[in-house]
Curated annotation (Swiss-Prot):
The modification N-acetylalanine is found at residue 2. Residues 491-501 have a biased composition (Basic and acidic residues). It holds the Pfam family Rabaptin. GO terms for biological process: cell projection organization; endocytosis; protein transport; regulation of cilium assembly. Residues 178-265, 381-408, 491-515 are annotated as: Disordered. It comes from Bos taurus. Plays a role in membrane trafficking and in homotypic early endosome fusion. Participates in arteriogenesis by regulating vascular endothelial growth factor receptor 2/VEGFR2 cell surface expression and endosomal trafficking. By interacting with SDCCAG8, localizes to centrosomes and plays a critical role in ciliogenesis. GO terms for molecular function: growth factor activity; GTPase activator activity. InterPro entries: Rabaptin, Rabaptin_coiled-coil, Rabaptin_Rab5-bd_dom. This is Rab GTPase-binding effector protein 2. It comes from the Eukaryota. Heterodimer with RABGEF1. The dimer binds RAB5A that has been activated by GTP-binding. Interacts with SDCCAG8; this interaction is important for ciliogenesis regulation. Interacts with RAB4; this interaction may mediate VEGFR2 cell surface expression. It is found in: Cytoplasm; Early endosome; Cytoplasm, Cytoskeleton, Microtubule organizing center, Centrosome; Cytoplasm, Cytoskeleton, Cilium basal body. The modification Phosphoserine is found at residues 188, 192, 198, 202.
Amino acid sequence: MAAAAPAAAGEDGRRRLPGAALDIQPQEGAKVEAESGELERLRAELAGALAEMETMKAVAEVSESTKAEAVAAVQRQCQEEVASLQAILKDSISSYEAQITSLKQERQQQQQDCEEKERELGRLKQLLSRAHPLDSLEKQMEKAHEDSEKLREIVLPMEQEIEELKAKLLRAEELIQEIQRRPRHPPSLHGSTELLLSRDPSPPLEPLEELSEDGGPAAEAFAHNCDDSASISSFSLGGGASGRASLPRSRQGLSPEQEETASLVSTGTLVPEGIYLPPPGYQLVPDNQWEQLQLEGRQLQKDLESISRERDELQEGLRRSNEDCAKQMQVLLAQVQNSEQLLRTLQGTVSQAQERVQLQMAELANSHKCLSHEVKRLTEENQGLRAEQPSSSVPRVLEQDEGWEESLPSSLPELQQLVRRTQQEARARQQAQEHEAERLRIEIVTLREALDEETAARASLEGQLRVQREETEVLEASLCSLRMEMERVQEEQSKAKRQEVLRPSQGTGRTEEAQLTDLLSEQRAKMLRLQAELETSEQVQRDFVRLSQALQVRLERIRQAGSLEQVRGIIDEAPLRDVRDIKDT
């Protein structure tokens, strides 16, 4: 009995457990259906996102190609700017070197001019040094003039004294004649003569004493040079009896004219002894020659002053030119340093730009790789989800029910743990799906931005196409004008030919024909060149149109693709980077 009771209890427990499992099973089925519906919705959204992502991928490839072209254009522009700056620097350096050489040549020329002026100045100094004897001669003439003035001051009082002596001599002769007329009284004659001679014995010496007192060194020099002691003593009448006895004898047989001549001769013998004689090597010149020499000396002095001023001006000009040259050299060196600094800055900027471009290219390549991997992963997940998806929900529910019935635990705590674990897994899957959906939304926004950029690039290409069309229209108009000009030239040529037939002279016609032929050849060459330019522009326009049409067709095919394989096939086609790709495809 005891054994039967536990067996019955076990059977009752087993009966209750399927009942509880049957109660839990409808709830889990509803949850699974809701999750499966959400999963289907997410899968549909994922498929749409994948299709849009594939479209964006194609657009990204096109934008990448355009970006590469833009980067290449920027690099070419930077290289052209660097080359132009280097050419400008070379031109500026060559011009600066030419200026420096010209300044050096000017400086050498100024130095040569200064040397020539210095040589001319030395020559003039030599001439002036040769003219120095004129200055000494002038000084000597002035000294002689002063000596003559002093001599004149000495001679004039002596002439007055001589006149007084002559007067006294005349009176003495008159007295002698009176005495001779009276020979009876010899004693009285002697007494009268003594009386006459003793009447004023000192006056002849008074002027000499006064002269010696007043004249000073000049009188002593005159007395020393003239040595007139004997002459003056000859006029002295108070020297004793011998003088008194010889006077009548010396004057007895002379007439007044002879006495005057003798006195003048004696005076002439006195004066030349006091005249100043120049030292040896010098000569006395007349006044007109002296004035001429003075004029020449003043003229030479003026020339010397003008040359000195010119030398000072040249030295000042040379100093200023040296300062200007130094300043210009400093300015040129500063400009060269600034140019070198600018070149280094530009080189650094270009290198930085190249580094940034390389980094951007690397980032774009990495992002492209990441995007490719992500697309592949999403494609694999999508394929896996599609492969795991059952044909209908009923067999899936039955299979799940059978699996759950088989995997249901036998105890209640285990069943509760299973429910909690299932709920956690469902929440984890939901969070993962939310994260995946958010990531897909971000990727969709990014791809839309790239699509907008591509649209802007397309708009810019259309603008360039319009500009090219306008240029083509201008070229067509110029071609039409050239054709009209060609027709006009042909008409003129035909007229010229007709006139040439009418003209008698052939030389003029040949010349005009040659000129018209040259003009025609020039116009033909010009027309051919314009036709070639027009054809080139038309070809470029056609290429732009074909490229834009091909891109539009490919984008439209990507948008209209129904499956991921079609999008991958469109993407795997050859990239449209050039018109040759369109021709090849």
